[in-house]
Each structure stands twice: as C-alpha cells, then as structure tokens.
A protein has these predicted regions:
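Membrane-embedded and interfacial regions of multi-pass energy-transducing membrane proteins
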Residues: 1-536
C-alpha cells in the first residue's frame, strides 16, 4: 500500500522538484537510447564497403539519433529537469507560478516519446531535418513519418507550456526589482524561454503544412502545385538555429554560476556583460538561420548578410569566455577538483567548436564543406559536447542539494579524463574527413579512410563507457551515502541556505524575493511567518 501511495504521489505530483526529476529520468533514458543508435552508426563504419546494417536501417538510425538527443535528452534535462528544479530555488519561491501547467508539460512528453518509438518501429528514415521532397508521401510513404511529426508536435507543445511557465515565474521575480543582480542562471533560462516561445510555433506551422501535404493533397512544399520546398528549410531553421542556443544558454548560466562560486566572490565579474552578451546572442541567433542554407541558391546579398551576422555572434560569446577565464584565474579552488576540470573542458571544447563555426560562417567555405563530415564535427563539438558537459556540471554541482550526498571526487576525475579522451578521439578526426571531402549521411566511404574511421569508432566506445561510468558514480554515491557537508563555494547565493537534501513541497517563502548578488541579503520566512534568519 505504501509503495502504491508513493507511486501515485509521483504520478500526480505538482511539486517542481519531483517534476524536474521525472524530466531528468526520461532524458537519461532517451540519452542512452540515442547513444545506442550512435554506436550502431559507428559500427557500420568499421568496414568501408560492407554495411553491417541495411541502408534503410542506417537512415532510421541517423533520424532517430538526432531527434532523441536534441528533443528528448538535452532539452528535458537542461530545461525541464534542472530548469524546473532551480528556477524556484534561485528565485526565492516555493514553486513555479503555474504548477498544473508544469505537470501537463511533462505528461505531454510521455505520449511524444511513445509516438517517436512507434515511428521507429514503422520506419522513418527522412533525417532529423525531414526536408521535403524526401519527407513527402511520394518518397516516404511510411506512416512512421506521420508519427514522427505528431511526436515533434507534442514535444513542441510541451516546451511552449514550459516556456510560458518559466516566463511568468521569472517575470514575477524580476518585476520586483528589474535591476536586481539575480543569478545568471535565471537570466539565461528567461532568454531560453523567450527563444522557445518565439521559434517553436514556426516549427509547428511547418510540420502542420507538411502533414497536410502528405495526407490531404495540399502543395505547400510541392513545386508541381506551386509550392516551394525551400520554404520548409527557412521555417525549420528559423527554429533550428535558435535551438542551438536554447541548448547552450542554460550551460552558459551554469558555468557562470560555478565560476562565481569557485572564486568565492561576492558578485559575478562582469555581471551585466554576461547578461547583455546572452541577450545579444538571443537577438543575433534569431536572424542567422539561413547560414544553414548557403547551398540552396541564395542570392549574393542575402548570403553576405547571413554570413556577416553569423561571424558577429562570436563577439558576445568571446565576452563570456574571457569573463569565465578571469573568474577562474582569480579562484582559489583546487585545480584538480572535478568541477574545475569540467568547467575548463567546457570552455576549451565549446570554444573550439565555435571557431570551426566561424570557418563555416563564410559562405564560400560552407558551400564546399556543407555536405561533409566537417559540419558533423562542428555541431557535435558545440551541441553534443557543450550541452552534455553542461549537464555533467549541473549534476556534480546540484547533486548534494537534490540527494544530500556527494559524489566521489576521484571517480569524477577519472571520468572527466576518460570522457575528454573519448570525445576528441571520436569527433576531432571528422574535421579531417570533411577537409578531404568525405560526404556525410552516406554509410560507405573510400577504403583509405578506414584507419581513421577506426579511431572514431574506438572514441565513440570510450565516450559511451564514460557516460555509463558517470551513471555508476551517481549510483555509487546513493549506495555509499557520502553525506554532503556543505555546498560548493562560499558566495552569497540563496541555495546555500537550504538544507540538503531539500524537502518535498516545502513552502520556503511567503512573498516574492529579490535576490541581490551585489549585497547578498536574504530574509527567509516559513509559511507560518516565523523568522528564520538573515544571510549577509
């Protein structure tokens, strides 16, 4: 009976912490499923002209690998998981403003996953970008493509509801004092929510038009009926490129927060620089979508505009990187600490991926490299490594607050070393592939590349081992019960006042709280208005 009650409590919970944990569990499951697909892809490249799996199955794998990793691994953990958990705590609230909408957002994700698994079974090999005419009924008649569209529709509605909830909650926080130097994490989640709310309806419209083309005889993207398939690319990438920043902005906030605490500083160095750099990235990132389309025949003026603005995005990103380096330079933290190693790994790998992005932003070079493995290497360094390392940093940082136990330092050091070796062995040689002209999305290749493909495959196995190793470290901490003695750092942040593990459905505050990093003064009240203490 107690087990059933606990199950029902989790099933019908409105608590932001439990919903965040549910999001995270779904994300971990999807992440390992996507990893298994990536291993099958890499195994297929062990032999140059012999396919371990059929070509149709290969198309199914690359389609579902991309969609799983982006929509069901990175977004649920970074936004649904840690966003749900951290926004109320860092804002001084007991929950999000719309808890029922929060629960609905999660439970829309479950049928979305079911539809995606159904599409896998029925077959949907249209690529994660599902461009027409390949995704039209003429060339992809399988009903699996329709289930894939429905899956993305539900995932999009879930994200829109979460974004509305986050914006309402953060508005109630910032409306008290807009000039408050609140946590950078809150600002990055606000910008992330604005990006999602702006771009997801455009993707939903594109998917709806494609469904009508496939099932009701319309011709939005069919040239024979007066449609334009390039229109779909514009609509898709109007969402697709800001999605990159949706996945990396929470990581920017977390790295800024970690650097602040490791420096034991009373305030973030260059706070307004970080916030306005994030805002600049949001604004610029929303108007550069066509740099994914340099090979479709854009006119010269359009290509030059999108190429130039893409290069400008490197400026606010550089402001962030140098701000983090300055804070790390002035920190007294042990340089062998796992959190320090991971933050440095994030800065180095993400910066390297950004530099290759500057290379691709030149429309002349992109025309040559667009359909090669160079692009695969670029977006894996930025999205896969940047966002994945953000998740690892968040787990290491907030695990004591969530569970009350700390992770094994020496195991984390080993895991960081193994991960970086695996990442770079897997993805760095892909730049060489691209410069040699090896085409992506093709499962056969010239035999002269077999030795370096072997290196990539070994690196992918090491990367998967590191992921499993990290889950083992989480499990080991729960079994060994290494009780956390305190939070990371000594900066004046409100989470340092909360007991760990944090209680279920505590009403911490009875009024909206303006959290000010500049002075670090917090007045904490329980629900019955009994004064607890002041942090100065």
């Amino acid at each position: 009976m107690r087990t059933m009650n606990n199950f029902l409590n989790w099933l019908f919970t409105l608590d932001h912490k439990r919903i965040g944990i549910l999001y995270t569990l779904v994300g971990i499951w999807a992440g390992f499923l996507g990893l298994s697909f990536s291993i099958m892809i890499r195994v297929n490249f062990l032999e140059p002209y012999y396919n371990v799996i059929s070509t149709d199955c290969y198309n199914f794998l690359i389609t579902n690998h991309g969609i799983l990793m982006i929509f069901f691994f990175l977004m649920p953990i970074l936004i649904g998981g840690f966003g749900n958990f951290l926004i109320p705590l860092l804002s001084g609230l007991s929950d999000l403003n719309l808890p029922r909408l929060n629960a609905l957002s999660f439970w829309l994700l479950v049928p979305s996953v079911i539809f995606l698994v159904t599409s896998m079974c029925l077959g949907a090999g249209v690529g994660w970008t599902f461009y027409p005419p390949l995704s039209s009924s003429l060339f992809s008649g399988s009903k699996g493509v329709d289930f894939l569209m429905f899956s993305l529709h539900l995932a999009g509605v879930s994200s829109i509801f979460s974004s509305i909830n986050f914006i309402c909650t953060l508005y109630s926080v910032f409306s008290v004092n807009l000039a408050s130097r609140s946590s950078v994490i809150l600002w990055t989640y606000l910008f992330t929510s604005i990006l999602l709310l702006t771009t997801l309806p455009v993707l939903a419209a594109a998917i709806t038009m494609l469904l009508f083309d496939r099932n009701f005889g319309s011709a939005f993207f069919d040239p024979l009926g007066g449609g334009d398939p390039v229109l779909f690319q514009h609509m898709f990438w109007f969402f697709g490129h800001p999605e990159v920043y949706v996945l990396i902005l929470p990581g920017f906030g977390m790295v800024s927060h970690a650097c602040l605490n490791m420096g034991c500083a009373p305030d973030v160095f260059g706070f307004y620089g970080l916030v306005f750099a994030s805002f600049s990235i949001v604004c610029l990132g929303s108007v550069v979508w066509a740099h994914h389309m340099f090979t479709v025949g854009l006119d010269v003026k359009t290509a030059v505009f999108f190429s130039s603005v893409t290069m400008v995005i490197g400026v606010p990103t550089g402001i962030k990187v140098f701000t983090w380096l300055y804070m790390l330079l002035n920190s007294n933290v042990n340089k062998s600490d796992p959190i320090f190693l991971w933050v440095v790994s994030f800065i180095v790998l993400f910066t390297f991926g950004g530099v290759t992005g500057i290379v691709l932003s030149a429309c002349v070079l992109d025309s040559v490299l667009h359909d090669t493995w160079f692009v695969v290497a670029h977006f894996h360094y930025v999205m896969s490594l940047g966002s994945y390392i953000s998740i690892v940093i968040m787990f290491i940082w907030w695990w004591p607050l969530i569970t009350g136990v700390s992770l094994n330092k020496y195991l984390l050091q080993c895991q960081c070393l193994v991960s970086n070796i695996g990442f770079n062995m897997c993805f760095f040689p892909m730049h060489y592939f691209g410069l040699c002209g090896l085409p992506r999305r093709v499962c056969m290749y010239e035999s002269s590349f077999s030795w370096i493909n072997m290196i990539c495959t070994v690196g992918s196995f090491i990367s998967i081992f590191s992921g499993c190793f990290f889950v083992f470290i989480l499990w080991e901490s729960l079994v060994s019960r290494h009780v956390a003695l305190g939070s990371f750092g000594a900066a004046s942040v409100v989470t340092n006042m909360i007991l760990s593990p944090i209680a279920y459905h505590n009403n911490f505050f009875t009024h909206y709280l303006s959290v000010n990093y500049s002075y670090g003064v917090y007045h904490i009240y329980w629900k019955n208005n009994v004064y607890i203490g002041t942090w100065t």
